[in-house]
Amino acid sequence: MYSTAACPYCQRAERLFSAKGVSSIERIRVDLQPERRGEMMEKSGRRTVPQIWIDDRHIGGYDELAALDRAGKLDPLLGIAA
């Protein structure tokens, strides 16, 4: 997950992952590593954080992550049995 320290949507994404029992999130802080922002934009086509991947699948930002959860599609992506 590409993120910054001051991003409320990044914090929401982390809370949602935590609530799902995800304990390991690879965080790439583009505020601390500005050169990684270009990488993020190239990979995602977006400029905003968070940009979230689950394995090799680009999810998008927090809104897309939350929509997957509401639709019941996040748990299978995380390998959580229904």
Describe the residue ranges of each PLM region.
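Local sequence-structure signature of Cys/Sec-based thiol-disulfide redox active-site neighborhoods
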Residues: 1-25
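Short alpha-helical
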Residues: 8-9, 35, 60
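Non-catalytic, surface beta->alpha helical segment in thiol-disulfide oxidoreductase systems
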Residues: 54-81
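Mobile, glycine- and charge-enriched loop segments
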Residues: 1-5, 77-82
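Thiol-based oxidoreductase modules, predominantly thioredoxin-like and allied folds used
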Residues: 23-37
